Curated annotation (Swiss-Prot):
Protein name (database record): NAD(P)H-quinone oxidoreductase subunit 1, chloroplastic
The keyword Translocase appears for this protein: yes
Keywords per UniProt: Chloroplast, Membrane, NAD, NADP, Plastid, Plastoquinone, Quinone, Thylakoid, Translocase, Transmembrane, Transmembrane helix
Pfam families: NADHdh (PF00146)
NCBIfam families per the UniProt record, alphabetical: PRK06076.1-2
Enzyme Commission no: 7.1.1.-
HAMAP family on file: NDH1_NuoH
Spans through the membrane: 27-47, 98-118, 129-149, 165-185, 203-223, 248-268, 269-289, 297-317, 340-360
Top-level taxon in the UniProt lineage: Eukaryota
Gene Ontology cellular-component terms listed: chloroplast thylakoid membrane
Natural source organism: Barbarea verna (Land cress)
GO biological process terms on file: aerobic respiration; photosynthesis, light reaction
Family according to the record: Belongs to the complex I subunit 1 family.
Length: 360
């Protein structure tokens, strides 16, 4: 009996140990996800602060300066204010569509961050079709905007939702064709493989030099996808008050505000990954892969810093464009997408395909 009791206790202890291992395994699954979300939130707060400071400098005025040092906590203060504001609903609107629309817009953009490689193999989901997963997920966001416009039962909101859907369709196709050209050059649809393909020749191996036409088209299309000036027709204040956001208040309005900057950040990250070499530094005799092999923590940290430095450099261009170019008319916007960018991007894809065939 004593031997039997001892055996039972031993088995129970092993069962508890296995249970603890399963619990720790589940915890470690969520650690990268929460770390990525925390990093995204921090990045959005920095973008908001940068845009306000750069805009203040362009307009020769003083930007935010009271909330925290240099006003860096102003975005956090604005978010807290929106969190405690009342959520109003249109009396004749469609409550399910009105409530779900902002969530769809934010979640679809957040999922796109899962395929971004911030450093050497530091990616949440290294998929073989990572780049097309981003395109597929990002095409869901306009559905949320259209639902918000329709569910508001407001003519300005509905027109804003229709404009957002039309604009997204018009510029999604040229953007996809540019991504196809990059995939042909890299022989892969994985974001990690695309970055590694650019690291073979250093600075001159960046796709920026191999695909200059595609880079310009991707830049214009990504600005249109983010609905930034001069492509902010879905929320044109002079015409539509606030577009599909007109009837929103409180945290739901804040979700649209966050979605705008999340989209801007993800577009800049994809420009870095697809055209600017990702985490690779273009200094002779210095390789991130060698640094990573010597010291993984140091190499990973340097890779993250390089990726974010390139991303925020591109963000400066996007922010400066807002105060440089006037807003297009709706017919001009659609003509630019369908009559100019689409044929040029298609021709660029055919040239890239021909080059790859002749180089075999």
């Amino acid at each position: 009996m004593i031997i039997y009791a001892t055996a039972v206790q031993t088995i129970n202890s092993f069962v508890r140990l296995e249970s603890l291992k399963e619990v720790y395994g589940l915890i470690w699954i969520f650690v990268p996800i929460f770390s990525l979300i925390l990093g995204i939130i921090t990045g959005v707060l920095v973008i908001v602060w940068l845009e306000r400071e750069i805009s203040a400098g362009i307009q020769q005025r003083i930007g935010p300066e009271y909330a925290g040092p240099l006003g860096i906590l102003q975005a956090l203060a604005d978010g807290t204010k929106l969190l405690f504001k009342e959520n109003l609903r249109p009396s004749r609107g469609n409550p399910p569509l009105f409530s779900i629309g902002p969530s769809i817009a934010v979640i679809s953009i957040l999922l796109s961050y899962s395929v971004i490689p911030f450093s050497n193999h530091l990616v949440l989901a290294d998929l073989n079709i990572g780049i097309f997963l981003w395109i597929a997920i990002s095409s869901i966001a306009p559905i949320g905007l259209l639902m918000s416009g329709y569910g508001s039962n407001n003519k300005y909101s509905f027109l804003g939702g229709l404009r957002a859907a039309a604009q997204s369709i018009s510029y999604e196709i040229p953007l996809t064709l540019c991504v196809l050209s990059i995939s042909l050059l890299s022989n892969s649809l994985s974001t990690v493989d695309i970055v590694e393909a650019q690291s073979k020749y250093g600075f001159w191996g960046w796709n920026l030099w191999r695909q200059p036409i595609g880079f310009i088209i991707f830049l214009i299309s990504s600005l249109a996808e983010c609905e930034r000036l001069p492509f902010d027709l879905p929320e044109a204040e002079e015409e539509l008050i606030a577009g599909y956001q007109t009837e929103y208040s409180g945290i739901k309005f804040g979700l649209f505000y966050v979605a705008s900057y999340l989209n801007l950040l993800i577009s800049s990250l994809f420009v870095t990954v697809l055209y600017l070499g990702g985490w690779n530094i273009s200094i002779p005799y210095i390789s991130i892969l060698e640094l990573f092999q010597r010291d993984q923590i140091f190499g990973t940290t340097i890779g993250i810093f390089i990726t974010l430095a390139k991303t925020y450099l591109f963000l400066f261009i996007s922010i400066a464009t807002r105060w440089t170019l006037p807003r297009l008319r709706m017919d001009q916007l659609l003509n630019l997408g369908w009559k100019f960018l689409l044929p040029i991007s298609l021709g660029n894809l055919l040239l890239t395909t021909s080059f790859q065939l002749f180089s075999l």
